[in-house]
Amino acid sequence: MTLLNASTQPRVGSGFRLQWEPVQNCHVLLYPEGMVKLNQSGGEIMARCDGQRSVAGIAGELEQEFSAQGLGPDVLAFVEMAGKQRWLAWD
């Protein structure tokens, strides 16, 4: 993976599948050995990681949708953590 920055376009990592789980009332990340239950913030970020949107674009969408400002550093930190867990990948 290349270095992470605001223009990085993350996508769900190979071997993982993101889906909404009505029973859990949250997004979950499924993989062969189990499941990761995401909190609302993590689910909202992961749902936008389609390999087309940049980290900055994702932060902008979330700021608009939730009437918030300054989410860029938090989104970047989540993407970095998710990349270390291999939940997300980028070129």
Regions found by a protein language model. Name each.
Residues 34-91:
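Long, charge-rich, low-complexity alpha-helical segments
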Residues 1-47, 91:
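Acidic, low-complexity/disordered tracts enriched in E/D and polar residues
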